[in-house]
Structure formats: C-alpha cells, structure tokens
C-alpha cells in the first residue's frame, strides 16, 4: 500500500508583497487510519530561496521534489524554466507518468502549480491550493485576500489550512508554514 498525501492540504499565498505556503501535518493510510499528524509537506529548497509543497503519494512526492530541485540547479534557480522542464519530463517519461503527486513551487517572484499531466499553472489571484482540502483552503484564502487585506501572507495561508481542517477530515490543524 502506498501512503498518500492526497488527503492533505497545501495553500500558497502572495499578499502585500510577501509569499507564504502552509500545509497540514496529517498522513492518512487509506480512508480510515491517521498514520502521522506531524508530517512536513512544505519545505525550503535551493539555498532556502524556493518553497515547495506537495500532495499525492509520499514516495512520488519526494521523487518529484528531488527532480525539481535538480532542475532548479540545472537552470540556475529559474523557477519557471525548472517547472516547465520537470512537467515536460514528467509527461513524456512512462515511469514518471505513473507518479501520483502535485507540487506547488514558489520563490519571491513566482508561484506555480506543477502537475503530472504536464501543466504548469500560474494563479490569476495569488493563491494556489492542492489536496483533499484544497478547494476549502482556496476559497478561504481568496476571501481573506479580499476582505482582510491587513493579514500577512503567512496568516492567510495558515488560517486557510485551519479552515480546511475544520471541514476536511483528511486535514489536521498541525500547520507547517514557510515564508519568503
């Protein structure tokens, strides 16, 4: 059985010129058992200049995070180029096509969603969210951006995860966040 991070929530926010990404800590085995409540699904890479968050199979997510960091090194930290190259490789390599994960990658200038079907998506409204609670976090973060402009990016991202955790049974309130 493969451990999945699908039952997780990651939210990235750009607010007031700052970026933050937050994720919950729950790892669920199947649909009935919480295996861990303190997993770190949001991490800094590339000399702490890039934050990556992932949802999907644990092994697949780590594999893709490692491949993405190699692409960042290959392209001297160019986030968009590294993301596009990873997406192209992911889509064209038959072994990689079987990987079940999504990545949100972010530096001080850009925020991108990278999927296994070859998409590299830049959000229209400075918020991205993935995982089982992703839609709840996305809606909450967008509402806070519109109506609570005094909140920091970190406060918005963390609050969005907490709101998702109140609704989604696969998301807990042990929030890990990183800011840029």
Curated annotation (Swiss-Prot):
Keyword entries, A-Z: Allosteric enzyme, Cytoplasm, Hydrolase, Metal-binding, Protease, Sodium, Threonine protease
EC number: 3.4.25.2
Location (main, coarse): cytoplasm
Source taxon at top rank: Bacteria
Listed GO biological process terms: proteolysis involved in protein catabolic process
Stated regulation of activity: Allosterically activated by HslU binding.
Active-site residues annotated for this sequence: 8
Record InterPro entries: ATP-dep_Prtase_HsIV_su, Ntn_hydrolases_N, Proteasome_sua/b, Proteasome_suB-type
Residues involved in Na(+) binding: 165, 168, 171
GO cellular component: HslUV protease complex; proteasome core complex
Signal peptide: none
UniProt catalytic activity: ATP-dependent cleavage of peptide bonds with broad specificity
One MF term in the entry's GO annotations: threonine-type endopeptidase activity
Subcellular localization: Cytoplasm
Subunit structure: A double ring-shaped homohexamer of HslV is capped on each side by a ring-shaped HslU homohexamer. The assembly of the HslU/HslV complex is dependent on binding of ATP.
Family statement: Belongs to the peptidase T1B family. HslV subfamily.
Function: Protease subunit of a proteasome-like degradation complex believed to be a general protein degrading machinery.
Protein name, per record: ATP-dependent protease subunit HslV
Organism: Lactiplantibacillus plantarum (strain ATCC BAA-793 / NCIMB 8826 / WCFS1) (Lactobacillus plantarum)
